[in-house]
């Protein structure tokens, strides 16, 4: 009953108004899975390739008809008749058929959409929720947890049209007893932040991930206004709510000069100086997690950063590791960072994503499941976070349906699982247990 009878691809629109790939996988017995590929703005150079058409007369070159042709043509032909329950085999067929190191023939956007749609179809055929099916694929059947959210409530960098260099300033509602309570706390801080920003004469328009995107005097001011909002919401900073940042430092790294150029603040730093700048912020504010604190190629700098901060806080590799087990293995061996950001479309299949999560956990690294800045209503990452018991999730702020869809799915899952899926809060963050 889980044999694939049809694979279908279509071009849909993501949260930034750009096309993306949506796929359907149909099985015997009428079971159907549907999934869409997300898309990033600040991307690591070693990510799997997102195939775009390049036809400037259509969607300004961002069309995905070539990827759709791959889904409806060679991918569909290769998968019809295969057993959808064997996810590893399904993904292996597509990867082998593509035949490139970075999935550039069909596009990671094509392969991923089919991979996730297949998992959803298989879950339907088994009569179980997607998170339960993912747990079985992961070899951890019946082991679930609700993730601690990192809520991106001030957007900067590539995610906003403002003068803030650091890309994301996030809150973690660590004082919550449940995921649902964490979402409520996040929403309350978010609304209070709007009031704080308005009182200072700042803009309250939102960026790509639903966080506010004001022009600020400094990166430290972003943390200061969040601290005010946390207090205004009736919570204690450092106890009820902790802070996290995604520097996305590759975006302001001048490769030729070898310096970090923070134009918003009018400052430049060497690797070592920037590490000490971050350490200063960690001393000043209850920051428990920093992502991509240096350029993806600055491994010597990351080694220094890990020595400086790795025992105190979580250091997450996003552009650094790009959900790739080969790169992660090298990072583990060299003691670089202590956590990995997990993005499906950086690697391009569910099987490879699960392998990256397992490798991280086996090495004592944490895994943070993440959205992309270009999203859809697809909430698969919520099921991935619960089904792998990853412990943490990054899926934007408390506005924009493309972000809130994931929180709402987590609320539903928590309701269904009850005590079978504990919410462990701050214990999930590396260095904070």
UniProtKB/Swiss-Prot annotation:
Belongs to the enolase family. Pathway: Carbohydrate degradation; glycolysis; pyruvate from D-glyceraldehyde 3-phosphate: step 4/5. Binds a second Mg(2+) ion via substrate during catalysis. HAMAP family: Enolase. It holds the Pfam family Enolase_N. Its cofactor is Mg(2+). InterPro entries: Enolase, Enolase-like_C_sf, Enolase-like_N, Enolase_C, Enolase_CS, Enolase_N. Keywords: Cell adhesion, Cell outer membrane, Cytoplasm, Glycolysis, Lyase, Magnesium, Membrane, Metal-binding, Secreted. Pathogens have evolved a strategy to activate host plasminogen and manipulate plasmin activity for their benefit; plasminogen binding (even without its activation to plasmin) increases their adherence to host cells. Plasmin activity leads to degradation of host extracellular matrix proteins like collagen, fibronectin and laminin, facilitating bacterial dissemination and disease spread. Enolase 'moonlights' as a plasminogen-binding protein. The gene is eno. SUPFAM superfamilies: Enolase C-terminal domain-like, Enolase N-terminal domain-like. Its EC number is 4.2.1.11. This is Enolase. GO terms for biological process: cell adhesion; glycolytic process. It is found in: Cytoplasm; Cell outer membrane; Secreted; Cell surface. The lineage of its organism: Bacteria, Pseudomonadati, Pseudomonadota, Gammaproteobacteria, Vibrionales. The active site is at 209 (proton donor), 343 (proton acceptor). The keyword Cytoplasm applies.
